[in-house]
From Swiss-Prot:
Family named by the database record: Belongs to the MVB12 family.
S-S pairs: none
Region (Disordered): 170-200
Record's protein name: Multivesicular body subunit 12A
Topology relative to the membrane: Peripheral membrane protein
GO cellular component annotations of the record: cytosol; ESCRT I complex; late endosome membrane
GO molecular function, one term: SH3 domain binding
Length: 275
């Protein structure tokens, strides 16, 4: 197996299994070492044996980025976990040395563990493989390298969904949201103003009435007593003796205005165009 071959599927999980019957279906059980010896990690005849197995099923979306063999007194690193056990009822795995792995999403890395091998202790070497350590008389080796993530497969669509998408009946339009805070009520208009704003027909458009004023059509002219001041070129000096203090009644009498002209202008009837 070459490291340069990027088409190799990476290892997605590792575990312990008593035999092929307890080993999950998508796992491969390592029954023999590279030098032909039995890969049973249990040396006794009374105890049930257990084997190292691995999987390359990527349906779970995870891959093994690294493998470590640590002692029972060692501390497992952050992001690592011990491999699961699929054993018979009375079987157990020795805890003197344990295998831990680091699982990562398949799309987050470009290199991962590609293969695992076992050899008998101090008897053979595996080219291009990394030695992880010895366990119960075996040496664990792993091969790391680049891999190509599987191409995403399109999910099958149901025919009913395709027919529904071709239907001419479009989805119902969304209903307008009702405001939680209704707009404030418009201010009340006085009786005189309401009469002036109404058109001759008696029907008033809200968009038009807001722009109508009682001063529409009334020409602007200055009072005669102010015309002499505006026409003179010399600025007259106002002394304190010219200031007259007026009472409230004098001001009301001077500026009293009945709006008679404006009422007549508002009541004017526009001539209708005869055909």
């Amino acid at each position: 197996m070459s490291v340069c071959d990027s088409s190799i599927r990476p290892v997605s999980a590792m575990a312990w299994a008593s035999n092929t019957s307890t080993c999950p279906g998508h796992f491969t059980l390592i029954s023999q070492t590279e030098d032909g010896a039995s890969a049973n990690f249990s040396r006794g005849f009374v105890r049930s044996g257990y084997f190292l197995c691995y999987s390359k099923d990527l349906s779970g979306g995870m891959v093994v980025a690294d493998v470590q063999v640590i002692t029972d007194k060692g501390t497992i690193l952050h992001g690592y976990c011990y491999i699961p056990e699929y054993l018979e009822q009375k079987a157990s795995v020795a805890k003197k040395k344990r295998v831990c792995v680091r699982l990562v999403p398949v799309g987050s890395v470009t290199t991962a563990v590609l293969d695992l091998k076992l050899t008998t202790k101090h008897k053979s070497m595996v080219q291009q493989y990394t030695c992880l350590g010895d366990m119960n008389g075996f040496v664990v080796w792993c091969l790391k390298g680049p891999f190509s993530p599987p191409a995403p497969q399109a999910k099958p669509r149901r025919v009913s969904l395709d027919i529904r998408s071709l239907s001419l009946d479009g989805p119902a339009p969304p209903q307008p949201l009702k405001p939680s805070n209704p707009p404030e009520a418009p201010p009340k208009v006085s009786r005189r103003r309401s009469k002036l704003d109404l058109p001759a027909g008696g029907v008033c458009d809200s968009s038009v009435c807001s722009g109508i004023s009682a001063m529409d059509g009334v020409p602007f002219t200055l009072h005669p007593k102010f015309e002499s001041r505006s026409s003179s070129t010399k600025v007259s000096v106002i002394t304190l003796s010219d200031i007259r203090i007026k009472s409230v009644q004098d001001i009301e009498n001077e500026y009293n205005y009945t709006f008679t002209v404006e009422e007549l202008a508002a009541k004017r009837i526009r001539p209708s165009l005869s055909g």
